[in-house]
A protein has these predicted regions:
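Conserved active-site-proximal phosphate/metal-binding subdomains
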Residues: 51-86, 92-216
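Active-site entrance/lid segments in N-terminal catalytic domains of soluble metabolic enzymes
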Residues: 1-80, 213
């Protein structure tokens, strides 16, 4: 069982494990790592701020403008738990994989690296935007869902910089707009989730991406 946006209570984790399930919890800080370990999680996804899409934070509170990157975060998590750690956020090439493993991760998790693959279910306009020079940066926003998420900066994000921390209310309110934007291929109003290393995403087979990441 995989959890994000929070960690289930220890009693519930114990029930999952008794039923034969392993429990995976996404964490973004040493405090969350310690809490998930204490609850009985089997392994942790340590998500750095470089990651695309929603931050896996347990709360919806504001985060510091500058947070430690993935590599120092792995080290901080390792100091509070000996559970296996899966590193996520900005993993785009063989050197990033090697750095995460050297820092103490047991494995890595990639998302943005596969967005432009033909096997990806991302909208064609989203795939194209990742290589479009008009989109030159990513930022964290609550504009689309009410929870912090990293994506390509487009008009909708620029027009709504102060969206409230109201999830799922904002998510429900923007759903019709996002659906209409996707139907029209309107990249200025779509949620173009992407990590900081989005320019490294290539339009090639997923197997080729895996080979490049593994260095084999």
């Amino acid at each position: 069982m995989s959890f994000t946006f929070g960690c289930p209570a220890a009693e519930l984790v114990a029930r999952f494990r008794a039923a034969g399930s392993l429990v995976w919890v996404t964490v973004i800080s040493p405090a969350e790592a310690a809490a998930a370990a204490s609850a009985g999680a089997d392994f942790l996804c340590v998500q750095g701020p470089e990651a695309g899409a929603h931050r896996g934070t347990f709360t919806n509170e504001d985060r510091p403008a500058e947070e430690p990157g993935l590599i120092p975060l792995i080290g901080e998590a390792r100091r509070v738990t000996d559970l296996p750690l899966v590193a996520a956020g900005g993993i785009s090439d063989r050197s990033a994989v090697a750095a995460a493993l050297a820092a103490g991760a047991s494995a890595v998790q990639c998302g943005t690296a596969f967005l432009r693959c033909p096997e990806s279910g991302a909208h064609p306009a989203h795939k194209a935007a990742l290589a479009d020079p008009r989109f030159s940066q990513t930022a964290v926003t609550r504009a689309f869902s009410g929870r912090p998420a990293r994506g390509l900066v487009n008009r909708f994000m620029r027009d709504h910089p102060a969206a409230p921390a109201a999830y799922p209310e904002i998510n429900n309110a923007t759903r019709p707009l996002r659906s209409a934007a996707a139907a029209a291929g309107d990249v200025e109003r779509m949620s173009l989730w992407a990590g900081r290393a989005y320019r490294a995403a290539a339009a090639r087979q997923a197997a080729e991406v895996v080979t490049a990441l593994c260095g084999t």
